[in-house]
Curated annotation (Swiss-Prot):
It is found in: Cytoplasm. The gene is grpE. GO terms for biological process: protein folding. This is Protein GrpE. Residues 1-34 are annotated as: Disordered. Belongs to the GrpE family.
Length: 192
């Protein structure tokens, strides 16, 4: 294909108008005639039309670029958060394994192998979900952050600064920085 066939209709019209204007100006200059006011007016209109077409073309190119950029961002987000629903469904499984370990009788020698198996299963599950961007929110003695914490209660404490997480009742999780589930926490307040 030639370069003319690849151009958009706006570019072709714009170039044709420019060429016609240049030829008319050259013809007028060659003949040495004085410029007729009507010709000058038409040349001015032509120049204005050419300018409008250029601006319109630039706006169209900018709009296409914006659409392309937005589409790329949407695709990137879709890839990044495609596992969000699946990840949210795994959280109760993680919670149940942690509860099983918390309630297990660690002094019973007969249960030691089972407890070790549950611990290894939990560790391997946390490692697997961690590879895909899931992070645990379970820190204590950090300032309360309403973006990742859900305050279940406020307790007076001399040991903790006010508005700090004292205790985590249920761990929270994020997926690539987006909250999957807030951590349910007890928040400290100053003694009255």
């Amino acid at each position: 294909m030639s370069s003319k066939e690849q151009k958009t209709p706006n570019e072709q019209v714009s170039e044709e108008m420019e060429n016609a204007a240049e030829q008319q100006v050259e013809a007028t200059q060659e003949t040495g005639e004085g410029v007729d006011p009507r010709v000058a007016e038409l040349e001015a209109q032509l120049a204005a039309a050419v300018q409008r077409e250029r601006e319109s073309l630039l706006r169209a190119k900018a709009e296409v670029e914006n659409i392309r950029r937005r589409t790329e961002q949407d695709v990137e987000k879709a890839h990044k958060f495609a596992l969000e629903k699946f990840s949210a469904e795994l959280l109760p499984v993680i919670d149940n394994l942690e509860r099983a370990l918390d309630t297990a009788d660690k002094t019973n020698a007969e249960l030691a192998a089972m407890i070790e198996g549950v611990e290894l299963t939990l560790k391997s599950l946390l490692d697997a979900v961690g590879k895909y961007g899931i992070q645990v929110v379970s820190e204590t003695n950090v300032p309360f952050n309403p973006e990742v914490h859900q305050a279940m209660t406020m307790l007076e404490s001399a040991d903790h600064e006010p508005n700090h997480v004292m205790m985590v009742m249920q761990k929270g999780y994020t997926l690539n920085g987006r909250l999957l589930r807030p951590a349910m926490v007890a928040v400290s307040k100053a003694k009255a």
